[in-house]
Amino acid sequence: MSDEQIKLVIVTGMSGAGKTVAIQSFEDLGYFTIDNMPPTLVPKFLELAAQSGDTSKIAMVVDMRSRLFFREINSILDSLEINDNINFKILFLDATDTELVSRYKETRRSHPLAADGRVLDGISLERELLAPLKSMSQNVVDTSELTPRQLRKVISKEFSNQDSQSSFRIEVMSFGFKYGIPLDADLVFDVRFLPNPYYKPELRDKTGLDTEVYDYVMSFDESDDFYDHLLALIKPILPGYQNEGKSVLTVAIGCTGGQHRSTAFAHRLSEDLKADWTVNESHRDKNKRKETVNRS
């Protein structure tokens, strides 16, 4: 059993107030997330999580979809209060009746408490039943005027144990066009216009991470010119992607085989961006040619 205290966030609130967006936001922040958790299973789940020691941050949606919600939630919260291994908070999402009705009309879904089909009646009953839980919540967020992106920013600011910049990650990868463009790439750049080290016998079996290849690739004026333009393009747009709520931006740089030119450029870009951002560097096809030769 781990001695580390489990950080638990119970996401609840009005139906239609944004709990789906919220739980996705917690997943982006590195939380283990569970949607529609029956209250009776919460203690057992937390016990297993503590025993495994693998999960230190958990966010779970507990709401009206569980029929025993109101009967069980108070006793569950009482048990959490006296558990020294659990540090829990309640995030209560709310919105005005007008906004909730509008959202239900837009999605054409029925309210879980609207027995006769009238959405407003269901909202009124739910608001009355949830009032005690709302009063116990440490975090109450009114989402009436928030876009999904804005709600994600609110949650990130409140519940991330890192600064907002480090919760946004940049994946810089090299690849070979002959093996296909990466499906998850957001930005793709082509460096096949540069001289190819493959045609230098002494460089053919090396990669862009080797000093000899890197220096060769970067020795040309067009390499420096292109890189300067590349960096000048990417740096100003990163805050925009971050502000839009994107958690990972994948920048892919390709050459013919992904072994020499693209690898050198991806490495250089990664090193320069690491001064200000969280960056992960990878080289998808760096060893593809060597593997192919060995199999033949």
From Swiss-Prot:
Residues that hold GTP according to the record: D63, M64, R65, S66
Binding, ATP: G13, M14, S15, G16, A17, G18, K19, T20
The keyword GTP-binding belongs to this UniProt entry's keyword annotation: yes
Family to which this protein belongs: Belongs to the RapZ-like family.
Molecular functions per Gene Ontology: ATP binding; GTP binding
Domain of life: Bacteria
InterPro entries: P-loop_NTPase (IPR027417), RapZ-like (IPR005337), RapZ-like_N (IPR053930), RapZ_C (IPR053931)
Pfam family, one: RapZ-like_N
Protein name, per record: Nucleotide-binding protein SAG0531
NCBIfam families per UniProt: PRK05416.1
Disulfide bond residue pairs: none
Keyword check for Transcription regulation: no
Keywords of the record: ATP-binding, GTP-binding, Nucleotide-binding
